[in-house]
A protein has these predicted regions:
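Active-site neighborhoods and metal-handling regions in enzymes and metal-associated proteins
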Residues: 3, 20-480
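Bacterial N-terminal signal peptides
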Residues: 6-17
Length: 480
C-alpha cells in the first residue's frame, strides 16, 4: 500500500503536461532537400515499418520517420531527384473495411498529403511507378528497413530489401546504391527542433528517476521501479519507455544489459537504473545508481566516485573539434587509475590474456586489466534511435555543435569475473593478486550516464538528475 500511495502522491505533485512539441512540416521538407542535394540525381526508395503481427504497438522506422514524419504502417516513399528539382511521393496502405475493424481506417491520400506536405498515392501503384522510373537511367538509392530484419539470420532480408532485390533482378543494368551513409551524416547533427524534442524526453526521464529515488527502499522489487518509471513517462506526456528499462540490483547491477527486472532488492544492494523516456519518437538515455538503503557504503562510495570522476573527465574535454579518441581516453585513464588504486588490477597499464585476444590488435585497451571492469563503450548519440548518430564510442571523428550524446562510464565487479579468463600463467598470477579485492567489491556495479549537447564552446549537461553522492542520498531522503 505504501508503494501505491507513493505513486499516487508523486503523480499529484507533478506539473501539468506541457503542450506537445512536434517537428515542423517544413523541417521534414528541408531534410528531403538536403538528401536530394547530396545525391544530385537519382531515385530514393524507402519502406516504412509493417503492421505488427498481433496487438503490438506500431513504431515507425527511424529513417522513414526522419524523412517523412509519416507514422502509419505499410507505407513507402519515393523521391525522384534531378539537378535543381525533386518530386516526392508517399505510397500508403489502401483502405480495407474488415481490417479497419481491428486497426481503424488509415488516412486517405488527401489527408496524408495535408499532414505531410508530400503527394500521396495508394501503395498498389508503387510497382508501376518504379517500373516507369527504371527506364530513366537514374540510379536507385535505397534506405533499408533495418528494424524489420531478423538479426539472428545473416541472410535474412527485410521487406524493402526483398522487394528491391526482386525489382533489380527484373531490371538488368539498374544501378542500386545504399543511401544510408548519406542519411546518417544528415542525422548526426540535431536541429533546434530536434534538440527541443530530446530535452523534453530527457526532462521526462529525470522526473521519473526522481520519483524512484524518493520511493526506493529494501524489499521493493526491481519491476516496481520499472513500473513507476513507465507510469511517470506516460502520465507526463511521453511515448513511454524508449527502450526496455534496466533495473539491476545486487549481482544484477554488474550485468550491462540485464533487463529481467524480477529480483527483490536487498538492503546492501546498489541498483543500476538505465532508463529513458521517448517523446515524439526521440529517445533519452540516462543511468543512475542508487544505494537501496539510502546511503552508500564505504566500498560503494569508492567505486562510485571513480566512475563519476571518469564521467567528469570526459565531459570536460568534450567540445567542438575534440577527437573521439581523446574523449574516450580521458575517461578510460580515470577508470584505470581508480581500479588499480582499489587493488582490482595489478597496475594502471597492466595487461592480461583475454578470451578475445584477436580484438586487441585493433583495440589494445581490450587487453588491459582495467578493461575487465568496463568493457563497454563510453557513450553514443541519441535521437530517433537510442543509439543514434554520432558514434563516438569507436573509430575516428570529432565532436561538432549539434551533437547530442551520452557519457556513461561504469565499473562492474561481477562475482564470476575471474571465471571467464583463460588458464594461462599470466592470468593465474593476476588472479592471485586481485582476488581479495574482487571478493571485497563483488556485486557492486556502478554506471552513471548523462545526456549532453555540444554547443559552440563545450558540452551542455542536459539530464540534470541528482548524481553526486551527496545529491543522490539527499534525494532519496525526501521520502514521499
Amino acid at each position: 500500500m505504501r508503494f501505491l500511495r507513493s505513486v499516487i502522491l508523486s503523480s499529484l505533485a507533478l506539473p501539468a503536461t506541457l503542450a506537445a512539441q512536434t517537428i515542423p512540416t517544413l523541417e521534414y521538407a528541408a531534410r528531403r532537400d538536403s538528401l536530394a542535394a547530396r545525391i544530385d540525381s537519382g531515385v530514393v526508395v524507402a519502406f516504412g515499418g509493417r503492421t505488427p503481427v498481433g496487438p503490438d504497438r506500431f513504431m515507425q522506422l527511424p529513417a522513414f520517420r526522419y524523412l517523412t514524419g509519416f507514422l502509419e504502417p505499410d507505407a513507402a516513399f519515393v523521391m525522384v531527384v534531378r539537378p535543381g528539382a525533386r518530386r516526392a511521393t508517399l505510397f500508403t496502405s489502401e483502405r480495407d473495411p474488415r481490417r479497419a475493424l481491428y486497426d481503424g481506417f488509415p488516412p486517405d491520400s488527401a489527408e496524408v498529403a495535408r499532414r505531410t506536405g508530400i503527394d500521396a498515392r495508394s501503395v498498389g501503384a508503387l510497382p508501376a511507378h518504379l517500373d516507369s522510373l527504371a527506364g530513366t537511367g537514374l540510379p536507385f538509392y535505397t534506405l533499408r528497413d533495418f528494424a524489420t530484419a531478423d538479426a539472428a539470420e545473416t541472410d535474412s532480408l527485410t521487406r524493402g530489401a526483398a522487394f528491391m532485390r526482386r525489382f533489380a533482378d527484373g531490371h538488368p543494368g539498374l544501378t542500386v546504391r545504399d543511401a544510408h551513409p548519406i542519411l546518417d551524416s544528415l542525422r548526426t547533427r540535431k536541429s533546434p527542433a530536434e534538440q527541443a524534442m530530446l530535452r523534453r524526453a530527457i526532462d521526462l526521464t529525470v522526473g521519473g528517476l526522481r520519483e524512484v529515488m524518493r520511493a526506493m527502499k529494501p524489499g521493493m522489487w526491481e519491476y516496481q521501479a520499472e513500473a513507476m518509471l513507465q507510469s511517470a513517462f506516460r502520465r507526463n506526456g511521453g511515448d513511454g519507455a524508449a527502450f526496455v528499462s534496466i533495473i539491476g540490483s545486487g549481482p544484477n547491477s554488474t550485468q550491462y544489459h540485464y533487463n529481467a527486472n524480477d529480483r527483490r532488492i536487498g538492503k546492501g544492494d546498489v541498483i543500476v537504473m538505465d532508463v529513458g523516456a521517448g517523446y515524439g519518437g526521440y529517445a533519452a538515455d540516462v543511468t543512475r545508481t542508487l544505494p537501496a538503503s539510502g546511503r552508500f557504503s564505504a566500498d560503494q562510495r569508492a567505486v562510485y566516485q571513480i566512475v563519476r570522476d571518469a564521467q567528469a573527465a570526459a565531459a570536460k574535454v568534450a567540445r567542438p573539434g575534440t577527437t573521439f579518441e581523446s574523449w574516450r581516453d580521458a575517461a578510460r585513464e580515470e577508470v584505470a587509475r581508480g581500479v588499480a588504486r582499489l587493488g582490482l588490477t595489478e597496475g594502471v597499464d597492466a595487461t592480461f590474456d583475454p578470451p578475445w585476444a584477436d580484438q586487441c590488435i585493433d583495440n589494445p585497451v581490450a587487453c588491459t586489466q582495467s578493461f575487465l571492469y568496463m568493457a563497454h563503450g563510453l557513450g553514443h548519440g541519441i535521437g530517433l534511435e537510442v543509439h543514434d548518430r554520432p558514434h563516438p564510442w569507436y573509430g575516428a571523428g570529432t565532436f561538432q555543435p549539434g551533437d547530442v550524446f551520452t557519457i556513461e562510464p561504469g565499473i562492474y565487479v561481477s562475482r564470476k569475473l575471474l571465471e571467464i579468463l583463460p588458464d594461462t600463467p599470466k592470468n593465474r598470477a593476476m588472479i592471485a593478486k586481485v582476488r581479495p579485492a574482487v571478493e571485497r567489491y563483488r556485486d557492486i556495479g556502478i554506471r552513471i550516464e548523462d545526456d549532453y549537447l555540444i554547443t559552440g564552446t563545450g558540452a551542455e549537461w542536459l539530464s540534470r538528475a541528482p548524481r553526486e553522492i551527496g545529491e543522490v542520498e539527499a534525494e532519496m531522503a525526501r521520502r514521499p
